[in-house]
Amino acid sequence: MLAIIVATMLVSAQQFIGVNLGYARPITQLNQPVVGQEKTLTPTPYNGFKVGLVYDATIVKGFGFSMGLNYTFAANSTDWKSEFASVYPQVSSRGYYHQIELPVDWQYKFEIAQRTWLILYTGPTLQYGLSLNEKGLRRDDKGNVTEYRDVNRYSLDKNDHLALKPLNVTWGIGAGFQYERYFLRGGYDFGLVNPYKSISFAGKDINTRGRFDQWQIKLGIYFWER
């Protein structure tokens, strides 16, 4: 019966299917296995892009939902800094982030002019990390650079203090604008789960804490409408 009701609502809904491309700023906020700092979350921002498909349906009087399938790539780097007391050697790191996302948002569209809407939305996103690679680089006083670490944090054993789970759930809130078949949407996603594989750091009486957040802004076009 419920399936029949849902199907009937979708048949009468205003529906769009399209594509979107935009800017993504994932942020890992993680604590470290250091006594006295176990409650401090250190943010590490990444900058990149996302691209994907989107389905949008307005069911009744502006209320509806939007869902999609996105791919996100982002990267970050740190400045060179001295590894020890002397100026050299210096160390730096590079990070690369690949992720698939399934957002499902409940939304309300305010029609401010003919086929022109302001949009408010909120909802969960299921994220699956394909890889989160971190490379450590070392530079000597002659400018020679060597790589001393290259790990995928999703593939590490849970006893490694860097090990993270690829599966994440966020809750987002945002706003948007649509004119005809063109749209702009932006918002912030708050991480809901601890991304560490273990509840505590191996060999230490310190619990792991953290979350994955994300800023995003997307431009898109609907190529199908009913």
Protein language model features and the residues they cover:
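Extracellular/periplasm-exposed beta-strand and loop segments of Gram-negative cell-envelope proteins
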Residues: 27-46, 74-100, 129-172, 192-216
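Outer-membrane beta-barrel channels and translocator barrels
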Residues: 58-62, 111-115, 180-182, 224-226
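Start-of-domain marker
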Residues: 15-66, 72
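Helix-adjacent hinge/juxtasegments
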Residues: 93-99, 106-109, 114-115
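Bacterial Sec-dependent N-terminal signal peptides
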Residues: 1-20, 116, 219, 223-225
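Membrane-proximal, glycine/serine-rich, low-complexity loop/turn segments characteristic
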Residues: 14, 117-119, 123-129, 189
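Residues on the lipid-exposed face of transmembrane beta-strands in outer-membrane beta-barrel proteins
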Residues: 19-23, 49-57, 69-71, 102-108, ...
